[in-house]
Amino acid sequence: MAIQSKYSNTQVESIIAEVSAVLDKHQAPTDLRLMVLGNCVTDLLARKVPQEARAAVAEQFSKALAQSVKG
């Protein structure tokens, strides 16, 4: 999603492959996959982002997601 990242493409792609493999293992349909990933994002925000910054981080994330699917 990000144009520039402090993480390598290899690192990102490796994690994506592992997460995808777990979802494949459970034969999760697309709607369940999206629900699980959304819940992971919500949990991550709740645990790792200070409460006063959560709304702004969630908004920034949602804008980046929307931009990434525009092509």
Swiss-Prot record:
InterPro entries per UniProt: UPF0352, YejL_sf
Coiled coil: none
SUPFAM superfamilies per the UniProt record, alphabetical: YejL-like (SSF158651)
Superkingdom field: Bacteria
Signal peptide per UniProt: none
Pfam family, one: DUF1414
HAMAP family: UPF0352
Record-stated family: Belongs to the UPF0352 family.
Protein name: UPF0352 protein Ssed_1809
Record organism: Shewanella sediminis (strain HAW-EB3)
